[in-house]
UniProtKB/Swiss-Prot annotation:
<dbReference type="InterPro" id="IPR003614">
    <property type="entry name" value="Scorpion_toxin-like"/>
</dbReference>
<comment type="similarity">
    <text>Belongs to the long (4 C-C) scorpion toxin superfamily. Sodium channel inhibitor family. Alpha subfamily.</text>
</comment>
<keyword id="KW-0964">Secreted</keyword>
<dbReference type="InterPro" id="IPR002061">
    <property type="entry name" value="Scorpion_toxinL/defensin"/>
</dbReference>
<comment type="function">
    <text>Alpha toxins bind voltage-independently at site-3 of sodium channels (Nav) and inhibit the inactivation of the activated channels, thereby blocking neuronal transmission. This alpha-like toxin is highly toxic to mice and insects.</text>
</comment>
<dbReference type="InterPro" id="IPR036574">
    <property type="entry name" value="Scorpion_toxin-like_sf"/>
</dbReference>
<feature type="disulfide bond">
    <location>
        <begin position="16"/>
        <end position="36"/>
    </location>
</feature>
<dbReference type="GO" id="GO:0005576">
    <property type="term" value="C:extracellular region"/>
</dbReference>
<feature type="domain" description="LCN-type CS-alpha/beta">
    <location>
        <begin position="2"/>
        <end position="64"/>
    </location>
</feature>
<keyword id="KW-0872">Ion channel impairing toxin</keyword>
<feature type="disulfide bond">
    <location>
        <begin position="22"/>
        <end position="46"/>
    </location>
</feature>
<feature type="disulfide bond">
    <location>
        <begin position="12"/>
        <end position="63"/>
    </location>
</feature>
<keyword id="KW-0528">Neurotoxin</keyword>
<feature type="disulfide bond">
    <location>
        <begin position="26"/>
        <end position="48"/>
    </location>
</feature>
<dbReference type="InterPro" id="IPR018218">
    <property type="entry name" value="Scorpion_toxinL"/>
</dbReference>
<keyword id="KW-0738">Voltage-gated sodium channel impairing toxin</keyword>
<dbReference type="Pfam" id="PF00537">
    <property type="entry name" value="Toxin_3"/>
</dbReference>
Length: 65
């Protein structure tokens, strides 16, 4: 697994306010844990720790809604 911003299918981050929201999202996707990273590179976004390799992560480039 890897530590990364979990991404939606359009390469967009999951915006957040609460750590609990991200921890639920990350663990549901197989990560060990997750939290809401405040004021990071992509604003307030969910960061997952030890996320499985088959789960999409935010990569450089545009986010397409």
């Amino acid at each position: 697994g890897r530590d990364a911003y979990i991404a939606q299918p359009e390469n967009c981050v999951y915006e957040c306010a609460k750590n609990s929201y991200c921890n639920d999202l990350c663990t549901k996707n197989g990560a060990k844990s997750g939290y809401c990273q405040w004021l990071g590179k992509y604003g307030n976004a969910c960061w997952c720790e030890d996320l499985p390799d088959n789960v999409p992560i935010r990569i450089p480039g545009k986010c397409h809604f």
